[in-house]
Amino acid sequence: MALERTLSIIKPDAVAKNVIGQIYSRFENAGLKIVAARMAHLSRADAEKFYAVHAERPFFKDLVEFMISGPVMIQVLEGEDAILKNRDLMGATDPKKAEKGTIRADFADSIDANAVHGSDAPETARVEIAFFFPEMNVYSR
């Protein structure tokens, strides 16, 4: 097991449902520490840059529109195997396929409005964390 950090975003649909606290409880109950957090309303430019890896995909425009539709909660999670733990907590991208008890099964409405984002690998996590948080604003506890 490795101590890792991962980026998590609670997307506009889940923020609008007022379930930030319930999602944070799941992180903490799984042994993940929230070592940085902020609320933001992403600009189109930031959303396009953050999701640039998907720029050629057919869903890119809809993804950007959704991510700028309301505020998001962005956090860095730290813990043993944080990336995998967070991905297990989130569940499948499509909430209809997500296991019962996962964040997406419980709070997401569709494959587009799917409540949360999480880094998928250590290198992705490093890039995504640096995008939203200068290193001096992330604190181990």
From Swiss-Prot:
Organism for this UniProt entry: Burkholderia thailandensis (strain ATCC 700388 / DSM 13276 / CCUG 48851 / CIP 106301 / E264)
NCBIfam families reported in the protein's UniProt record: PRK00668.1 (NF001908)
Name of the gene encoding the protein in the UniProt record: ndk
Keywords recorded for this protein, A-Z: ATP-binding, Cytoplasm, Kinase, Magnesium, Metal-binding, Nucleotide metabolism, Nucleotide-binding, Phosphoprotein, Transferase
Record's catalysed reaction(s): a 2'-deoxyribonucleoside 5'-diphosphate + ATP = a 2'-deoxyribonucleoside 5'-triphosphate + ADP; a ribonucleoside 5'-diphosphate + ATP = a ribonucleoside 5'-triphosphate + ADP
Family in the record: Belongs to the NDK family.
GO molecular function: ATP binding; metal ion binding; nucleoside diphosphate kinase activity
EC number: 2.7.4.6
Coarse class of the protein's main subcellular location: cytoplasm
Protein name from the UniProt record: Nucleoside diphosphate kinase
UniProt subunit comment: Homotetramer.
Any one GO BP annotation for this protein: CTP biosynthetic process
SUPFAM superfamilies cross-referenced by the UniProt entry: Nucleoside diphosphate kinase, NDK
Sites where the protein binds ATP: K11, F59, R87, T93, R104, N114
Enzyme class: transferase
Coiled coil, from the record: none
Function, as annotated: Major role in the synthesis of nucleoside triphosphates other than ATP. The ATP gamma phosphate is transferred to the NDP beta phosphate via a ping-pong mechanism, using a phosphorylated active-site intermediate.
